[in-house]
Amino acid sequence: MKQIVITLLLTFAVVTLKGQVLQSVPERVLNHQMDMKAPLPEPLFKMDTTIVRVHILNWKPSMCVFNIVNLNIQDLSSFLALNYTGQINNDGLAFIRIPLRGVADASIGIDNDFSSYFLLNPGDTTDVYVDLPRMREVCRAYMEKQSERVDYGFGNNDIPTAEQTKRYMISNEYGLDTQPFLWFEGGCADLNTVCHRYMPFLKYNPWNMDLENRLMVNKHLKDRYVDDMLKRRDYLKKQIKKDKRLPLCAKQYISLSVDLQAERCLRSFIQHHYRGDVNSIDSSSKENAMLKQRYISILRSLGTNTNYRAYLKHSDYSDFSSKFFSGVFSDNELCDYLHDITLLYDYSSRINNDEKLSGDEMEQLRMPFYRNILQQQIDAQQIVESEEYNGDLLEDLRNRYKGKVVLIDFWNTACHGCIMMMNYMEPLKDTVFKHPDAAFVYITDHVSPVDRWLEFRERIRGEHIRLNDKQKAELDKQFSIRTLPTYILKDRQGNFRNINGNLNDFKIELDKQ
């Protein structure tokens, strides 16, 4: 399988449990009564193992190409999505054990179809019941709609009509309130159930951001955009507050998502019109100084400077975010989460580029949770440094695997397709590709964070090699590597060739006498 590199990371976990195929959702789940008064708890900043049991209703192996559940995760330590997988057993159950770092967003993927997001907490056990045909129906309807180009009838320099600027609430358009495809038990079940049934598919809140992005850059709306956007925010919050379907925890969660989207709208508006953050606004004139102070006051009044925003992580970690928030809040005013996540983003990048951190820099992190994460990355980097590869790779492989047939997998931890194929291949090493002459080599570079790379090295059998950028670039050129994963085959005579993802060539070469 060839796939352009995308920003997903993947890890694998499989446990087989005996039982029977579920024909329907258990009655105890269907009859569960939500606690309508329970508030949204503070987000968890801790590391613990989370267990997710995915039950496919009316399961048959013929329902999937790969009988694997992909669980896409973004926790409080990762700047890209992680992906854990579980094999679906004969009973339609996939058991996935996750070393979770803080509260996480999750979605289920089966083949090329995926679910809406739900929440996982470290230490919880969550059961997810899936109506796979219904999930595919909704997912494909969603993807078809995303491919449609919406024409709002006005450009950046046009004067839009009142009708064109009319905002409307995005609702769940796929009938999930009466025909859901996910049911939850354990963990954040109430909140997950509400978001799945009543929130827009794969969105955090009811903003129409396609229209919003068009409005904020229109030059004729510049003077009124912020006021109109804030009116919209207030309207949405009122609608949420009076929605009797929602328990208190969901009202607080969705209301926070609206506030965060208002914050991001204002940030994007300032960035577009003033080419940067609030500090970019020229305050030399009295009018501009007042305007700058007004924007700062609005941002402070949104109430988003809180650790609760960890529930709805988007782009809180970036150089721009760090500069933006420093222009609105003093360092002492920033909530612990915002303070530490921007530092972690910077520190992690430096560690991955072989830079050293001082003890003073480590002490700047307020939360033990993030100090522990950073220390794990430092420890992993030290292991990698002691094993840095500096040889002639192809010649070394010829000598080390003389007379062997070697499958060389070029991959990285940001490639979803790479990891899916690694997971698929692992059990085949004991069946289809079981041969005394078979060998497996996995090659990556600095794109793969060291701590994640070490996790894969422990789990995926074979030799794992980490190259520097120059070495990787030379091999990319030699073998015309443009997509990942790419498979290079070394035959018994020591010749190397790109097999263009055709793993059958590896099997044919093994079977040669």
PLM region spans:
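Bacterial Sec-dependent N-terminal signal peptides
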Residues: M1-S24, Q513
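A non-transmembrane, solvent-exposed segment enriched in polar/low-complexity residues
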Residues: V21-L248
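Oxidative protein folding and maturation machinery
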Residues: C139-G403, T431
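Conserved redox-active cysteine motifs that mediate thiol-disulfide chemistry
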Residues: K402, F410-P427
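Conserved helix-turn-beta segment immediately C-terminal to the redox Cys motif
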Residues: K404-V405, M422-I443, L510-Q513
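Alpha/beta-hydrolase fold active-site loops
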Residues: V405-V406, P485
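Thiol-based oxidoreductase modules, predominantly thioredoxin-like and allied folds used
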Residues: H435-R452, R459-Q471
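Thiol/disulfide oxidoreductase modules built on the thioredoxin-like
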Residues: K470-D511
